[in-house]
Structure formats: C-alpha cells, structure tokens
UniProtKB/Swiss-Prot annotation:
Listed name of the protein: Transcription factor AP-2-alpha
Region (H-S-H (helix-span-helix), dimerization) location: 280-410
Gene Ontology terms: cellular component: nucleus
Gene that this polypeptide is encoded by: TFAP2A
Organism per entry: Bos taurus (Bovine)
InterPro entries reported for this sequence: TF_AP2, TF_AP2_alpha_N, TF_AP2_C
Modified residues (Phosphoserine): S239
Domain comment, as recorded: The PPxY motif mediates interaction with WWOX.
Cross-link entry Glycyl lysine isopeptide (Lys-Gly) (interchain with G-Cter in SUMO), positions: K10
A molecular function GO annotation: RNA polymerase II transcription regulatory region sequence-specific DNA binding
C-alpha cells in the first residue's frame, strides 16, 4: 500500500514537469510546495511599461527646484514678479494641486524664508526689497531711509527700466542719473554710503568726500603734514586747464609706481564717477606747483603772506629810495606819484579779494562778472589756490613800501623847510584860540 502511494506521487510530479516544459513556462511556484528543495522561490521577471510616471511623494516642506509653468496666483500684484519680456521658456511638469496651493501661499507670505541654496535658482533674484536696500548689510545709515530722491546724487550705472503694471516699487528706492543738489542736513548721511560700483548705490558721489590723504612735499621730516584730497579736487585736476593723465595724477597723489598702477587708479576713479581714459595727454605745462595739492598750495600762500607782512623791509627800502630823489623840486611830483600808485594797488587788491574761485570743499557764489571771474578761476586752477593769495601778499608788501615812502617824504620835507613847520604851528594855535573864544 505504501509502495503504491509513493509511485502515484512520483507519477504526478513527472506529469507536472512535463506540462511545464510543454507550455514553455516554469512551474516554480508549485515546486515550492515540496519541502525537500533547499532554495526559495523567486518573483517573476517581468517589466510592464507605464506611460504615466508618478514621481515619489514628498512632504509639504519640500520645495521643488524647477519653476512651475502655470501660476494659479498670477492675478496677485506681486512687486517681485518678472516682466513678460524677461520671462524664459520653462518645461512642462505635472504638479500636485494640493501641495502647490500650500507652497504658493507660503511663498506669498514668507518670500524671504526660502533656503539659501535656492536663492541662486530664483529668476527674480535681481529684484531686491527696498527694506533690504535701506536697512540691509550695506553700511547705509539709518537716516538714509528718510531721504527723498532729490537729495541723493546721481548714480554711475542706470538700472534698466521697463514699464510693467505688475512691478510696484516705491520711488524712494529708484536712483536716477543726473545732477542733484545735496542739502546740508543730508550730506553726512550720504557721505556714509560706501562707494562700490557693484552695489546699487555704487554711483553715489559726494564732492566733499575725502578721496585720499597725501603727505606734504614741502614740510620737514620732523613735522610732516597730511592734506586731504576731496573728490571735487580730483575732478578739477582732471578737467581743464591741466587735464592730468594717470601718471601725473598718481605722482600728485603720491601713489607708488607699480605695473598696474594706472589701471588701478582708473578703476578707483571710475567708482566715484570720474573717467580717466588711457593714453591721455596733459594740456598744461608741468611746473613745481603741479606736484602740490590744493591744501598744501593754500598753506604755502598763507605762509608767504605772513612772511611778506612781517619780514619785508618796507621802511628800509623806502628810506633808501627817497635818498636817491632828494631834490626839493621833485618831492611834490614824487609824492603825487606815490599817492596815485597806492590808489591803483588798492583797486587791484580789492578786485582779487572778490575772487570766488572753487577751492577745497568751498564753491562760493560769484560776485564778479563771468568774464573776469573765468579768467581768475583759470589762474587759480593752474596754481591750485596759490596764485591769488600770493599776488595779494606781494601787492600788500608794495603798499607797505608806498606808505613808508610817503612818511619818509613828509619827514624830509619838514626837515628841509623848518619855517613851514613853525608857520603851521602858529596857524594851529590861532585856530585853537578862536575856538576857545
């Protein structure tokens, strides 16, 4: 009985194997029922292509790095939205409606909360918030936020502007190129702006801002003085009548010679809005005054005036010249000539005193006519502030000589005519007696 049961099992097993071989498919799942096999069953090797590929599900905090082609919130007035002219073709990607709504609502309310690594992929990265411009890490003063647009100087680079009703940017954040007047109350706040061409405020130039400090050339080593060179002074040195080139300007500013010294100087000037083309030729002849900055030239003129006022031997020169013209017949004529010369010198010094040429940080309003003022300004620009004060000091020394010469002539006349002195005393005594009566 047991032998027949064993034969039936073997016979059924052979039929199963034969059927599997004839049908062309392996009956592997049925073999797994036999406990004698040491191997486990394997899944069927088959691949069914699926046209609708579903991306894996991500939780809501995940932000898709690809831009969405369709925006359900396009009707919202977003100040950071791009103009249609700047839009780029974007690939079509299927999205999840529920997840996109939560993401778009989060982007509208927390636009600044995006991860730092996604900021470079945002096509709107060139548009910045005006709060960041006024209070961001640019070194801007707190008082700059209250400045109106007319209180800011012009910018070097213009921001391209495209009319778009979707862009709503306040006027206070737009900097336009053009001459703008600076008020005294806002000059300190504007001068605190760092000059950097890469930033939005890179073109802001304050003429009174210090460009650099230059050590004096005429001072002793024991008392070296430094003079501040403003942006306005550099602009005057690059403008007519001097028109300095990069080499001469570098020497005036005491910059060390290097291989790329001219290029670095031009780049530094370009940041403050001054253009210095390469290969430029100077317009004026180089003199010793060319090496002086305005501060040192004015200092030299002031010291020269002090020396002329205190040390010039006006009295000794007047007495010496009067002895050479001691003829009594010439004294009256000579005295009239001295008086006329003194009057001419006074008119000349009064004219120079009305000179209002720009110098240093000052640009006073002109008093003289434009024709004569332009000539005086030309002379002042060539001498860098030394010319007019030095001429006034020299003419003042001449006036002191004329005054001493008139005094010496009066003494000489009285010494040569003692009777006239007694007659004058008698006349004065008679007048006093009549006044007493």
């Amino acid at each position: 009985m047991l032998w027949k049961l064993t034969d039936n099992i073997k016979y059924e097993d052979c039929e199963d194997r034969h059927d599997g071989a004839s049908n062309g498919t392996a009956r592997l799942p049925q073999l797994g029922t036999v406990g004698q096999s040491p191997y486990t069953s394997a899944p069927p090797l088959s691949h069914t292509p699926n046209a609708d590929f579903q991306p894996p599900y991500f939780p809501p905090p995940y932000q898709p790095i690809y831009p969405q082609s369709q925006d359900p919130y396009s009707h919202v007035n977003d100040p950071y939205s791009l103009n249609p002219l700047h839009a780029q073709p974007q690939p079509q990607h299927p999205g999840w409606p529920g997840q996109r709504q939560s993401q778009e609502s989060g982007l509208l309310h927390t636009h600044r909360g995006l991860p730092h690594q996604l900021s470079g992929l945002d096509p709107r990265r060139d548009y910045r918030r005006h709060e960041d411009l006024l209070h961001g890490p640019h070194g801007l003063g707190s008082g700059l936020g209250d400045l109106p647009i007319h209180s800011l100087p012009h910018a070097i680079e213009d921001v391209p502007h495209v009319e778009d009703p979707g862009i709503n940017i306040p006027d206070q954040t737009v900097i336009k190129k053009g001459p703008v007047s600076l008020s005294k109350s806002n000059s300190n706040a504007v001068s605190a702006i760092p000059i950097n061409k890469d930033n939005l405020f890179g073109g802001v130039v304050n003429p009174n801002e210090v460009f650099c400090s230059v050590p004096g050339r005429l001072s002793l080593l024991s008392s070296t003085s430094k003079y501040k060179v403003t942006v306005a002074e550099v602009q005057r040195r690059l403008s007519p009548p001097e028109c300095l080139n990069a080499s001469l300007l570098g020497g005036v500013l005491r910059r060390a010679k290097s291989k790329n010294g001219g290029r670095s100087l031009r780049e530094k000037l370009d940041k403050i809005g001054l253009n210095l083309p390469a290969g430029r030729r100077k317009a004026a002849n180089v003199t010793l005054l060319t090496s002086l900055v305005e501060g040192e030239a004015v200092h030299l003129a002031r010291d020269f005036g002090y020396v002329c006022e205190t040390e010039f031997p006006a009295k000794a020169v007047a007495e010496f010249l009067n002895r050479q013209h001691s003829d009594p017949n010439e004294q009256v004529t000579r005295k009239n000539m001295l008086l006329a010369t003194k009057q001419i010198c006074k008119e000349f010094t009064d004219l120079l005193a009305q000179d209002r040429s720009p110098l240093g940080n000052s640009r006073p309003n002109p008093i003289l006519e434009p024709g004569i003022q332009s000539c005086l300004t030309h002379f002042n620009l060539i001498s860098h502030g030394f010319g007019s004060p030095a001429v006034c000091a020299a003419v003042t020394a001449l006036q002191n000589y004329l005054t001493e010469a008139l005094k010496a002539m009066d003494k000489m006349y009285l010494s040569n005519n003692p009777n006239s002195h007694t007659d004058n005393n008698a006349k004065s005594s008679d007048k006093e007696e009549k006044h007493r009566k």
